[in-house]
Amino acid sequence: MEFTEAVRRRRMVRSFTDEPVAPEAVDRILDIGRRGPTAGYSQGVEFVVVTDDAVRRTIAGDDDMFVESGHPNFVAQAPVHVVVCTSPEIYRARYREPDKMRAVADWSDEDLWEVPYWYTDAGAAVMLMLLAAVDENVAAAFVGSHADELRELLGIPAGYLPIGIVLLGHAAPDARRYGDVMAAPRKRRPLTDVVHYGHWSA
């Protein structure tokens, strides 16, 4: 599939069938995710893959409000959950090493991490997996995480932050309808509105 086609076809799917996702497809999606940019080659982003029905239902428990409103619990429906985790300390340790320009004794997060690399790298991994899912003809969505609950449930070490979950599955026939109910569709802002050349324009 051409890259531009994958970008244009990507959608957040909020209703899944019970059809499983081939493990080989999941592995390829994860492999693409790990190939994202990583500051200083820190490689502090890791994934927990959850396929167990009971565990997925537990993870989805915090989304009961959707069910109460008459929507499917799409988090529980998705047969694969990829919990994306990132480690701030791995990045801090990497940037203390001699080959990094910022290896100074008195650095602080406030000085050097105004926009932390561990979040931008994790976001890049998420985006790559969402696009890879399109290429695999797999439906996907990204949802925020309840970090403390996920850490306890999945045994995630204290030094790692669960930043969200990539849901993988196959879209149900009503997927677009439920997506529109949960977030009214809007057209993309035109390129001329979002791009500023040389100086921010009105």
Regions found by a protein language model. Give the residues of each.
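Residue-level "edge-of-site" marker
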Residues: E46, H146, G164
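A glycine-rich helix N-cap at a beta->alpha junction
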Residues: E68-H81, I156-Y178
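C-terminal helix-cap and adjacent tail motif
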Residues: F3-V13, P88-I90, G164-A202
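A short N-terminal beta-strand-loop micro-motif at the entrance of redox/enzyme domains
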Residues: V13-R28
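Short secondary-structure capping/turn segments at boundaries of alpha-helices and beta-strands
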Residues: D31-P37, V67-H71
